[in-house]
UniProtKB/Swiss-Prot annotation:
Subcellular location: Cytoplasm
UniProt keyword annotations, A-Z: Cytoplasm, NAD, Oxidoreductase, Pyridoxine biosynthesis
Swiss-Prot/TrEMBL GO biological process terms: pyridoxine biosynthetic process
EC number(s) per entry: 1.1.1.290
Name of this chain's protein: Erythronate-4-phosphate dehydrogenase
GO molecular function, one term: 4-phosphoerythronate dehydrogenase activity
Protein's UniProt keywords contain Cytoplasm: yes
Annotated active site: R209, E238, H255
Location (main, coarse): cytoplasm
Biological classification of the source: Bacteria, Pseudomonadati, Pseudomonadota, Gammaproteobacteria, Alteromonadales
GO CC, one annotated term: cytoplasm
InterPro entries: D-iso_2-hydroxyacid_DH_PdxB (IPR050418), D-isomer_2_OHA_DH_cat_dom (IPR006139), D-isomer_DH_CS (IPR029753), D-isomer_DH_NAD-bd (IPR006140), Erythronate-4-P_DHase (IPR020921), Erythronate-4-P_DHase_dimer (IPR024531), NAD(P)-bd_dom_sf (IPR036291), PdxB_dimer_sf (IPR038251)
Family affiliation: Belongs to the D-isomer specific 2-hydroxyacid dehydrogenase family. PdxB subfamily.
Residue positions binding substrate: S45, T67, Y259
Length: 376
């Protein structure tokens, strides 16, 4: 079986090596001629999968995309040809949720304003919004969810209006897809009027799409209201964010909230599982076996951690300050934004760090937060 795979997709050899011959290709320049005799095609978002690419192939058994979105894939064409397709929804959700949570802990320390006791509004309750809520709820934080589409679909969770979040939330974390038209348009969902309506001292975290906030309006409002604190991982006009906006953010990064080693591996692993299912063979590989050993074997806790100690545990896994500093130093360079993304040392997730604790205090919340080893 000939497996054509984007050369930048990780962990392909250990997962798919037993299933066929792996042929790495440049996903951006892939041609119909290269695909002609492939049995399996594994791509990323840089490859347009359509009739032009696949019309010369009559033996394709499976197309997989190690991505959350499917904008680059002509799903109707694949369905017409009866070619099975799978992507990797939610593969980086844990990474995004932990990134947002860590950013909130960092702001809490910087401004001596504890996260505990605050109300967090999450706009968008899909995979990444749900992962963020999971972290916050594990820590005992009250969460308000806004997602009119999920609510209309009958999702059993409690939802509130965006106006309620604007009025009540101390922190707002954005997790919606970009939608440019229709009833639930998200482009400039946070326009000048909504930004001005935010509660005093609101923290605004954006880990979804830059266009969800009107960036020009954000500059204007932030200059008028220094009480607003910003964490921006995404920007209008990527890869060239407005240079005057970056200094106004407390933490600024180049669209890397989802960049974890676990998330990267999970995307490929989900495609491996799907192909094994299609071939009716056992998926006997383990996701954990793919990942390198974490550089800290375990952390012994003498007591259940307070918020300052929790931030230190989080920093053992990922220190947001490092990426923030690097981004500020490089984003104005030619290709600085994309270069930092391409060369990013994918961080680990909380699960990489084992905690050892023999005390009597209740520490299940650390396990719920994602750390391993707690209470075991």
């Amino acid at each position: 079986m000939k497996i054509l795979v984007d050369e930048n997709m990780p962990y392909v050899e250990p997962l798919f090596g037993d299933l066929g011959d792996i042929i790495p290709v440049n996903g951006r320049t892939l041609t119909a001629e290269q695909v002609r005799d492939a049995d399996v095609l594994l791509v990323r978002s840089v490859t347009k999968v359509n009739a032009e690419l696949l019309s010369g192939n009559n033996k394709l058994k499976f197309v997989g995309s190690a991505t959350i979105g499917t904008d680059h894939v002509d799903l109707a064409y694949l369905a017409e040809r009866n070619i099975p397709f799978s992507n990797a929804p939610g593969c980086n959700a844990t990474a995004v949720g932990e990134f947002a949570f860590i950013a909130m802990l960092e702001l809490a320390q910087r401004f001596n304003s504890p996260l505990k006791g605050k109300v967090v509004g999450i706009v968008g309750a899909g995979n990444t919004g749900t992962a963020t809520a999971k972290c916050l709820q594990a820590y005992g934080i009250k969460v308000l969810l806004n997602d009119p589409i999920k609510a209309a679909e009958g999702d059993p969770r409690s939802f509130v209006s965006l106006d309620t979040i604007t009025a009540q939330a101390d922190i707002i974390s954005l997790h919606v897809p970009i939608t440019r038209t229709g009833e639930h348009k998200t482009k400039h969902l946070f326009d000048e009027a909504r930004l001005k309506a935010l509660k005093p001292n609101t923290w605004l975290v954006n880990c979804c799409r830059g266009d969800v906030i009107d960036n020009q309006a954000l500059i204007k409002v932030k200059r008028q209201r220094d009480d607003l604190k910003l964490v921006l991982d995404v920007w209008e006009g990527e890869p060239t964010p407005l240079p005057e906006l970056v200094p106004l953010a407390e933490f600024a990064t180049p669209h890397i909230a989802g960049y974890s080693l676990e998330g990267k591996a999970r995307g490929t692993f989900m495609l491996y599982q799907k192909l094994c299912q299609l071939l009716n063979i056992t998926a006997d590989k383990s996701l954990l076996d793919l990942l390198p050993t974490f550089n800290i074997k375990a952390v012994e806790l003498a007591t259940a951690p307070n918020e300052k100690a929790l931030l230190q545990l989080a920093r053992f896994v990922y220190d947001l300050r490092d990426d923030d500093k690097m981004f500020r130093n490089t984003f104005l360079n030619e290709n600085g934004f994309d270069t930092m993304r391409k060369n990013h040392q994918h961080r680990r997730e909380f699960s990489a760090l084992a905690l050892a604790y023999d005390g009597q205090s209740e520490v299940d919340w650390l396990s719920n937060l994602g750390f391993s080893g707690v209470g075991q």
